[in-house]
């Protein structure tokens, strides 16, 4: 499993997750996997909800794209639950994700702004998940988990790009980029406020990325 994290330099995040976070959450792999399973379930549900929010003929292939994302996320859910159950874990009936919930509160009401924000928030969650999976893969001494999280990086990166490119087709590129940077800044602030614990989007001391300013992700 490659430990080179230079691929993360291309991500547009406004903060970077330290390796110490990964080492801490990997100390309780069963609870981490449980949280991850719910993350994949919500990601699949989000894609299915967006499927019926097709914004019109200007975005052909919308339904096919969203069904593809939902299919991928459901496959990830199956993978993570298999690992979880094999290790003696189970899925709780109730699960809270204050990180994602806080991001979704930033979505403006009323289309087209609402659907644009939903795409950008989805992209922000995917790109942070992408980063976290890469850090987990690099930090894990568990060969199965390291390989699992390394393999997820490419898929989550693809989903992030899908959501971002769809958003860029919905409105003036400059307006989309401005909103994207606003949401990325908010994402970093929201993540920094999260409590520590064995969760994919748990909090830690996140160093800001100062060199060169925020990246556009494009």
Regions found by a protein language model. Name each.
Residues 1-218:
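Non-heme di-metal
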């Amino acid at each position: 499993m490659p430990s080179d994290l230079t691929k993360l330099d291309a991500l547009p995040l406004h903060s970077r997750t330290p390796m110490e976070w990964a080492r801490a959450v990997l100390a309780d792999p069963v609870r981490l996997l449980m949280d991850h399973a719910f993350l994949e379930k919500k990601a699949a549900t989000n894609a299915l909800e967006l499927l019926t929010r097709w914004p019109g003929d200007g975005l052909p292939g919308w339904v096919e794209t969203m069904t593809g994302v939902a299919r991928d996320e459901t496959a990830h859910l199956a993978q993570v639950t298999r690992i979880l159950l094999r290790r003696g874990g189970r899925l709780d009936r109730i699960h809270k994700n204050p990180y994602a919930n806080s991001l979704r509160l930033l979505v403006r009401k009323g289309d087209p702004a609402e659907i644009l924000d939903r795409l950008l928030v989805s992209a922000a969650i995917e790109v942070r998940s992408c980063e976290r999976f890469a850090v987990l893969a690099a930090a894990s001494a568990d060969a199965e988990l390291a390989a699992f999280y390394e393999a997820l990086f490419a898929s989550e990166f693809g989903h992030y790009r899908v959501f971002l490119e769809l958003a860029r087709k919905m409105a003036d590129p400059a307006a989309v980029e401005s909103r994207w940077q606003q949401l990325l800044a908010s994402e970093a602030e929201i993540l920094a406020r999260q409590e520590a614990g064995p969760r994919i989007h748990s909090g830690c001391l996140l160093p800001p990325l100062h060199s060169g300013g925020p990246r556009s992700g494009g």
